[in-house]
Amino acid sequence: CGGEPETALPVACAVEMLHTFSLIHDDLPCMDDDDMRRGRPSCHKVYGEANALLAGDALAMLPSQIIAQAGIKGLIDPMAALKITALLNERAGIFGMIGGQVIDTENEGKQLPENIILEMYRMKTGALLDLCCRAGCIAAGAGADKQLAASEYAGKLGLAFQIIDDILDVTADEKLLGKPVGSDAESGKYTYVS
């Protein structure tokens, strides 16, 4: 799409913070209750649940601030910064990652039809990857056609990632996976594989 590294950096940092927020909250006992993340103790195991919740909350808020500051400082075109901030909040919110997590948590132990599983994946992983791809395009000044192509790519990549993650949860060893194998089934999560 073009663009300069100085333009990409605040966008990449904002997206990574949002992703980290989602992982911290996802590991909490009230969500997936995972004690391990990438082979290391999860945030709430190291710092306690309250601090993990607050760290996640802070990381959910910082991306908008980073993008706004990049627009104010001229690192990103101000209108592009507004568009990225709107997209960031849409993809993180009830129509994106948080909405997908609601579907996930509200349906533990229930057999879900394929279309609901795919919608959940689209809203969780797909929304984050769509944000990555489209925000980069917007920051670089790419047109609507490239943004649409990036969005379509992100959707397919998100679905592929989630299906691979489901397969690994059943077939991988704990060392490779970085968390206990079979944790989805153990917690009553219905996945594409199950």
Regions found by a protein language model. Name each.
Residues C1-S194:
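All-alpha prenyltransferase/terpene-synthase fold signal
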